[in-house]
Amino acid sequence: MSDKERERERSQSRERSRTRERSRTRDSKRDHSDSRSLRRRSYRGDRSRSPSRSRSRSYSPSRSPRRKRRRHRTSRRSRRSRREGDGRRKDGPRGHDDRSPLAPREVEDVTVKREDSTNDKESTHDKESTNDKERNVSMEDRKDTSEDVVEDVEEGDPSEEALEKKVKNPEDDLEAAAEELKKLMELKSGGRYVPPAKIRALQKLLVQDKTSKEFQKIQFDNLKKAINSLVNKVSAQNIRDIAGEIFTHNLIRGRGLFCRSVMTAQSLALPYTPVYACLTAIVNSKLPQVGELLVRRLILQFRRGYKRNQKDVCLSSVTFLAHLCNYHVAHEVLVLQLLHLLLETPTDHSVEVAVAFIKESGAFLAEVSPAANNGVFERLRAVLHDGELEKRTQYMIETLFQIRKDGYENYPVVQEELDLVDEEDYVTHMTGLDDKFTDDKLLNYFVMDPDYEANEEKYDLLKKEILGDSDDEEEDDSEAEEEADDEEEEEGDEEEEAQASTSAVRDLTGTELATLRKKIYLTVMSTMSIDEIVHKLVKLSRTVIEIPEGLPEDQALILRLKRTQEVTNMLVECCAQEKIYNKIYGGTGERLLRLSREWRTNFENTFGFFYSVIHRYEPNQIRNIATFFGYLLASDSLSWKVLEAVSLTEEDSNPSNRIFLKIMFTEMRQELGMDLLKERLSKPFVQQYIAGMFPKTNASHVRFAINYFTAINLGPLTDGMREILPGLVEEEERLKKEEEEQKREYDSYDSYDSYDSYDSYDSYDSYDSYDSYDSYDSYDSYDSYDSYDSYDSVSEDDRGRRRRRGVGSRRRSLTRSPGSRSRPRSRPRSRSRSRSLSRDRTGSPPRGRRRSRSYSRSPSRSYSRSRSYSRSPSPRPKSKGAKGRSSYRAASYSRSRSPVRRVGYSRSRSPSVSGGSSRSPSRSPCRSPNKGRAPTPEKGLSPPRKRVRASDLF
């Protein structure tokens, strides 16, 4: 055992012994008091049983007062004896009559009995206490140890060092310290007392490891306490300081704690709701996820309260939501949904909650959506005239009408001292009453974060961005004040120039454009009828847009067109945000298109813009946008010219574009019908605009368009393309063949002169390698065909026959002639080899001599078979004489893209007909077609050289 373990055991034994001593001291004191009470009882009993007092035990009413006085006197004597101590108590009770002969003897007997009973009780109690200590030694040791620790700390013992020693030295093992802390926290949560000093000591040890779960738990508890403290301290006077201080804590991690603290504080103090709403708006402007979570939880809280008929819960929830709408944290659509739910089936409680809701948000609703506000008050007037509510509720409605008449003087939208958020920093959440979401209760509790340090660093950067602006502004203000004291006049001039330049820059930036978009969005979303939306949008496009003074007319016109374009873009954006397509948007677009040509141009540009970026939207948004434009096209409000931007090909389209077109054409078919839609698309002035969707020139594009429209159940629209598709396919095949033939001719003519290098006689020795082609026995299978009987080997006797047929052979050919009609695959061969030189200067194929190699096997009947091996592809002959097997069969093997001209080799059973030297060069080029072999022109050795086309030979 180590020294530390021995020291730990000794300290534990000392603590146990000290615990036993204290327990014995307490037991002895308790037994001493019991013995004194026993002594008093025994003393009175002995005196009552004495012979002199035996007669007093009989009942006598006259003696009862004396008995009471005697008891009272005895009790006084016992109290005096307890005050005087044990030493005088042994001599007998004070005030006893020593002259009585029974007194000393009775006192001695009582003393003996007292001592015996005391000893017996002490021994019995010691045994019981020992057993109890053995059974519960762990819990008693912990409790007594904690008490000793607290006593030592209070007496002035150094708490840090002493406490660490007495808590079993958890620094040696952090895991043991964590387990000990866990046990203590469980005891504390179960109602047991745990010294805070002991918990702090363990926590201090665990703080050293920042990746541990205990450290994160401690930090989470500290975060909860800090947020709760700041929320409880906030007021209208210190909200600026509290808002800056609350950002120093990690609100992303503690957003659930913040929402819970704010909701709890607001429900307990409804008059402070504007303060909590302002604090939430400040946090929401920098961290929108916090504001969204709070809105969701308030909606869920209202739902639960409404289902359970809890008026207080509903009242606190709608009050908070009303002020959040005033600060643009929640949208006014949520206000209208709540009022519709409360006034749909009016009761006393629902009307009371609705009245309180309208008091807080009535001014905001009248400013943003006056039509909806009027509808709400009309509903309240109808409820009031029904007279089914209590008098108290009716009086509340009448009071609300009076408040509205006074212009909500006591219920402003935002109080002046709480107007701390700029309009540009508003972040509005489109959360509806019927949306499906959760309150994320897990955020209220601790969850270990594996990336704790990384997330903390990220929030530190975010905190610097949020709080750094205010620090910079304060520094700038202080510097400006110092400079103002020194140079007031110069700085005044600079400020004027800066303001002038700033105003000019602000007019040309997107700040006003963003404000315009917000106004358009709020106008469209809060208006109930088409006429009202059109009127407000036209008014916004004319009055709200301010053109900077001094701007040239052309630039002012461009700026105005750009900003009016935003009206149409925002109308389509609002339509895309809807969960289900609303026909109000289609009617609004139709009305705007019929106002002027400017609106038509704007919508045409809008269609092209949204079609080009449609892949950025979700499927539901694509559906709404496509339905909107489909309705405009079907109603002839939007020009068909917009379809010029559509190119329906596999290369130019993507899945989002195809989905958009499918939904748009489906909407047009629903509005017009298939027959009328087909008639519209077949009109001449429309055909020029839909050429990209219904192509008529490219067969592959036509085929793709036909397949697409057939797949979306719009096959009748492709009847015209189906008619022209076969002609396009034939035309493409014909053009393809012509291109291939032209390419072959071009390649052959370009490589025609490349064979002049064969003038050297010795260069033909390399062609001896063609003898190896005898190994191609696979071609022997052709000998079984009867069609080859008419062909003989190349000899003197069959030249006339070849001349009559008009077929010349100017190439080196390899011919094999079997000994019989069908010969076996393996047979002996005998060959005679000869080489002959032929020169042809006239270029006529049948008359010239040729250089050949003939292999004679036997003089019997043979088949003439010529194999020509070339290094380039051979063109097909165009003449009829080259078709089929009208000439001898030749197999052509292409090795490369080299010219078609080559030297041929012939094998024959008959002797060679050619004369001349056995080894001589030949300049006769040869074109070898694939199947039907046709003679090719020969190039002479002497000038003039003449090029002969293949077509001239047939």
From Swiss-Prot:
Residues 1-172, 467-506, 733-766, 781-954 are annotated as: Disordered. It is found in: Cytoplasm; Nucleus. Residues 147-161, 468-498 have a biased composition (Acidic residues). One of its GO terms (cellular component) is catalytic step 2 spliceosome. Pfam families: MA3 (PF02847), MIF4G (PF02854). InterPro entries: ARM-type_fold, CWC22_splicing_factor, Initiation_fac_eIF4g_MI, MIF4G-like_typ-3. Residues 749-766, 781-793, 855-873, 885-929 have a biased composition (Low complexity). Associated with the spliceosome. PANTHER family: CELL CYCLE CONTROL PROTEIN CWF22-RELATED, PRE-MRNA-SPLICING FACTOR CWC22 HOMOLOG. This is Pre-mRNA-splicing factor CWC22. It comes from Yarrowia lipolytica (strain CLIB 122 / E 150). The lineage of its organism: Eukaryota, Fungi, Dikarya, Ascomycota, Saccharomycotina. The gene is CWC22.
